[in-house]
Design a protein with these regions (language model features):
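Residues immediately within or flanking Cys/His clusters that coordinate Zn2+
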Residues: 26-31, 52
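Short cysteine-rich clusters marking metal-coordination/redox-active sites
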Residues: 31-34, 47, 55-58
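Short functional micro-motifs and their immediate structural scaffolds
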Residues: 37-39, 63
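Short linker/helix segments within small regulatory modules
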Residues: 42-52
Length: 92
C-alpha cells in the first residue's frame, strides 16, 4: 500500500510500480532515472518535487545527495496533492 515516507523536507510517496501504473493509467512502469522497467510488485518512490518515480536503488542514491530549495515548494506541493489521492495517500 502506498504511503508517504520521511525524506527531510521532500514530499515522497513510496508505492509499487503497479500502484503507480494504476494511478497514471500506464501499461508499464519505468524508473525515471535508470530507465529500467519494473514488475507490478516492485517498490519505488514518487518524488513530488521532480514529478518522477524512481526505483528503490535510484531513490536511495538521489535522496543521499538531494538538496531542498524553498522556491520549489509550490510546484512540489501541487504535484503531491495531485498524485497522493490517486495513490490512496491522504494529503497533509
Amino acid at each position: 500500500m502506498a504511503k508517504q515516507i520521511e525524506a527531510g523536507k521532500f514530499l515522497v510517496i513510496e508505492c509499487t510500480a503497479g500502484e503507480l501504473m494504476d494511478a497514471v493509467g500506464s501499461d508499464i512502469c519505468i524508473c525515471d532515472w535508470c530507465g529500467q522497467p519494473y514488475h507490478l510488485s516492485d517498490k519505488g518512490c514518487y518524488i513530488a518535487v521532480l514529478n518522477h518515480w524512481y526505483c528503490k536503488k535510484c531513490y536511495e542514491e538521489w535522496v543521499s545527495r538531494a538538496e531542498w530549495y524553498p522556491e520549489d515548494a509550490d510546484v512540489e506541493r501541487r504535484n503531491f496533492n495531485f498524485y497522493a489521492p490517486r495513490l490512496g495517500v491522504k494529503c497533509q
